[in-house]
Design a protein with these regions (language model features):
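Internal, active-site/partner-interface "lid" segment
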Residues: 103, 274, 288-306
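Structural signal for hydrophobic packing residues in well-ordered secondary-structure cores
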Residues: 10, 28-35, 92-96, 100, ...
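Flexible, glycine/charged-enriched surface loops at secondary-structure junctions
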Residues: 35-39, 149-159, 288-295
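A cross-kingdom feature strongest in bacterial/archaeal respiratory oxidoreductases
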Residues: 8, 16, 20-69, 136, ...
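Short, charged, low-complexity patches
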Residues: 85, 89, 269-273, 277
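A glycine-rich, hydrophobic/aromatic-adjacent loop/helix-cap motif
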Residues: 119-187
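Long, well-ordered, tryptophan-enriched scaffold segments
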Residues: 5, 14-124, 128-129
């Protein structure tokens, strides 16, 4: 939010990192804050500051394959294919270093970044194109060199990468070798037993690759919470606890290791994944792993195995920590009425579950005071709304938390390290009559878990293929029509599917976008070249409602007593008259 110039390369952060998108919306207002300072206005006088600035904003350059929700605040938008986005980034890096480009858009972007005191470069992996990430790093390198050369400036450039999943960076740091699924499949005959740890490979491998894996003779053990297509072919499936029922450590995109704890006790006979792995090790005769009894021991072992993970032991206190001799309650004082929840079944309060792995208790008993910030289960204070009570846990209003920072940085910002070359040659060659597929992420739908809940899946909508107005006119299709996509790749079976059409106002030339992560688009590969044609047999979808009370009608009818009052009967007549016409909200 402190940046005064932003360059976004190939990332639609509204859908891949919504919190970053909110921060960027705040960042473009820094120009208004600067004008307010010159005029003697306090920043908190929001109406006056907005009136002074009008439409003046800090520069934000968005270079993407398709339109984004941040286009309305961008000073410049450029629509390019993924390989051209990488070229654009490298050209900006050279322009910052003093080699102007023939492309005026490149020079404008470079000038905006050079004139900034706190420039920010944002990129990510959503396009699945490593050259885009490299180009963002090259721009950051060029900005660092520029700022260091000017000794009068005490400013720094910033670089932010958006990651696909919550622990993508942590898993990358754990991997000593750059092992890939393709390399794994190439040597399945060398693997006696394959353990799949909470990873739905049916979303990451094609059906042919799944068949190759399951028919290789390798024994497959899966630790999984949710059912998927691969589990039926596994030799052993162990039911793992969900993230809300187990403990662990995540590494954020900032490079900060943060501990998470169970929200509620694990149900049924499931165990946390680390406990299943420990039991498997004991069954296979691995005595060293079998002796691990607590998660803290695993954390300590990780810290001892690698210098990079040494801070893990200090991320959070161990399970023996007590606040003034007591565990820290997960529940607020408002949970005092919990005994009445099941009073219709039994007036006896059930015995609360114990938690031997954390300093927290599954109850409201304990002391929520003076503990480290990483062990604060909730923010609540008498007389304050929950979000406003945060100040009670800070050393000062809008200041740091009183219990110290949450987590430990494994990766610290540095001005030195490996550098990225500003040279890049694209390998993609376009064929006449074909369009390049680029993934288009949705905040609801692209994530694996977002469609597991019916209400969220309804927000996700159906899978789609997005095209520009000119291509839509050429193919004679409109929003909601069907479009056939045919992809032929060397050495692989051809892929043919039909998707609903979505027309975008801004899309890179020779590109079509598809909704990434949807079950019907998993077979499509980013960068593949596709043939497009209208699907005349496509059934158009019915108009979608924002909300409907149809379900509430059904629930109310099912729960109604058998003897209706006169008012109920009159209401039933009204509903019979309006049957099938849900009310819009």
């Amino acid at each position: 939010e402190t940046a005064d110039a932003v360059l976004i390369l190939g990332e639609d952060v509204t859908h891949t990192a919504p919190r970053v998108a909110l921060g960027l919306r705040q960042a473009v207002r820094n120009k208004a804050h600067e004008l307010a300072k010159q005029a003697g206005l306090a920043v908190w006088q929001d109406a006056a500051v907005r009136n002074l600035a009008q439409d003046q904003r800090s520069p934000m350059i968005i270079v993407s394959a398709m339109e984004t929700r941040l286009d309305d605040i961008a000073s410049q938008t450029v629509s390019l294919a993924p390989q051209d986005i990488a070229l654009f980034g490298h050209a900006v890096a050279r322009a910052i270093a003093g080699q102007p480009s023939d492309d005026e858009a490149v020079n404008e972007a470079a000038a905006a970044l050079k004139n900034a005191q706190r420039p920010l470069v944002v990129s990510g992996s959503s396009m699945l194109h490593s050259a885009i990430v490299d180009s963002a790093a090259a721009v950051a390198d060029a900005l660092t060199d520029l700022l260091q050369a000017d000794s009068a400036q005490d400013d720094s450039s910033m670089l932010s990468f958006c990651l696909p999943e919550c622990n993508s960076l942590g898993l990358a740091l754990l991997s000593e070798e750059q092992e890939t699924l393709s390399r794994l499949l190439a040597r399945t005959d060398e693997i006696a037993v394959l353990v799949i740890l909470e990873n739905n490979l049916s979303r990451r491998l094609s059906p042919d690759q799944i068949d190759k894996l399951t028919s290789s003779g390798t024994k497959i053990i899966a630790l999984e919470l949710l059912d998927n297509e691969l589990l039926a072919s596994c030799d052993l499936v162990l039911s793992a606890a969900s993230f809300a029922e187990s403990e662990g450590t995540l590494v954020s995109s900032e490079g900060r290791a943060q501990r998470y704890y169970p929200v509620f006790p694990v149900a049924h006979e499931r165990l946390a994944s680390w406990q299943w792995l420990r039991d498997l090790a004991a069954a296979s005769g691995h005595t060293e792993l079998a002796e691990l009894q607590h998660f803290d021991q695993i954390t300590a072992a990780c810290g001892a195995s690698n210098e990079l993970f040494k801070p893990l032991a200090s991320v959070s206190p161990d399970h023996n920590f007590r606040s003034h001799g007591q565990k820290i309650p997960r529940q607020t004082h408002r949970a005092s009425g919990r005994t009445a929840i099941n009073a219709d079944v039994s007036v006896h309060e059930p015995l609360r579950k114990l938690d031997p792995e954390t300093p927290l208790s599954f109850s409201m008993e304990g002391l929520n005071r003076d503990q480290p910030a990483s062990l604060t289960p909730f923010y609540w204070s008498p007389g304050w709304n929950s979000n406003q009570s945060l100040q009670k846990f800070q050393s000062e209003v809008n200041g740091p938390l009183r219990g110290g920072p949450v987590g430990q940085r494994l990766l610290e910002p540095q001005a030195t390290g490996s550098r990225q070359s500003s040279e890049f040659t694209p390998l993609q060659v376009m064929d006449e009559g074909k369009w390049q597929l680029v993934p288009m992420h949705r905040v609801h739908g692209s994530d694996e878990l977002s469609v597991r809940t019916a209400e969220v899946a309804e927000l996700a909508g159906e899978a789609f293929v997005a095209i520009g107005p000119e291509l839509a006119a050429k193919l004679e299709v409109v929003d909601g029509d069907g479009l056939k996509i045919n992809v032929e790749a060397a050495g692989l079976d051809s892929i043919e599917t039909s998707l609903s059409v979505k027309i975008l106002t801004r899309l890179a030339p020779n590109c079509v976008a598809y909704s990434a992560g949807y079950s019907s688009t998993l077979a499509l590969q980013p960068g593949a070249l596709a043939l497009l044609s209208k699907d005349s047999n496509w059934p158009r979808a019915t108009p979608q409602l924002i909300a409907s009370d149809r379900n509430s009608y059904a629930n109310e009818t099912n729960n109604r007593p058998s003897q209706d009052t006169d008012i109920d009967k009159g209401r039933d007549k009204d509903r019979d008259r309006d049957k099938g016409e849900p009310r819009h909200v």
